[in-house]
């Protein structure tokens, strides 16, 4: 079916209007009218081929919120008119241990990304959410609670689940001392989720101007990382540190902020490997771990939690012809806190 969107035609090129064909709605598929599509920093990395060879033309976008417009004859989970979300992957093998546990993002055969890859037939190029419509197997989409505005929902499908998953996995509850490194598109969701779960939340940021925002989102403390003395003052303070930063840092400074048995979870993808001083871990039985998005059951759990607690991403809604400027502003950290494209403008 004919689809209108925006695509990068080659590595590093500006995105331009682009028409392409999506598959027709199959027996187990749902079609959605895309209302909003979030801009993730990873979209920029992939358009610029900074994470390895990419497939062009590329229609980016894996933060998709819309309304169901048609369903296949075998669909049981959705009906026309439902609010629906699609995230970072659109398929997996469905048979391995991870998939059977609902951890499709760790599929042994590799998840099928929403874009910049091939669908499971190995031939069809996956095109993402910077477009006016989408078709997906019902098992890889999630229901959006009716009380949540779709513009603020779109980034939850990547930024939101990326923070919700480790917060749940490391059992954040009332009184847990959590630090969030960085207050950007990822970090601001970590603050909101951890605060809603009753944690004592500290934001660690090099941008003092963000303190008021951090506190408004639920943070109890704000520490500027520009002053080395501040690291000494909060040494051995945290049960869990969520690292959303992709810039080069001395990770050992932050590991020293963990209590005994504390864990630092790497979420932001650094440009270079960290140089970890093993003694920092051994001396207090600390751990350093990683986490990547979340599976379909956890995505649904997250959205239900957001519906119950009225949690949304802070967004700036743009028209499709502003995408290239939005990329520039995202790189310059000039957004509070996520750009979202109005799907009606494709």
Predicted feature locations:
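NAD(P)H dinucleotide-binding glycine-rich loop of Rossmann-like/cofactor-binding domains
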Residues: 93-181
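Glycine-centered, small-residue-biased loops immediately flanking beta-strands
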Residues: 262-263
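N-terminal Rossmann-fold NAD(P) dinucleotide-binding loop
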Residues: 187-188
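C-terminal hydrophobic helical "lid"/dimerization subdomain
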Residues: 3, 296-346
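Rossmann-fold NAD(P)-binding glycine/threonine-rich loop
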Residues: 268-285, 296-302
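Adenosine-nucleotide cofactor-binding segment
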Residues: 174-183, 193-253
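Helix-to-beta-strand junctions that scaffold the AdoMet/dcAdoMet cofactor pocket
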Residues: 258-259
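Glycine-rich beta-strand-centered segment in the early N-terminal region that forms part
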Residues: 23-37, 50-100, 105, 145-147
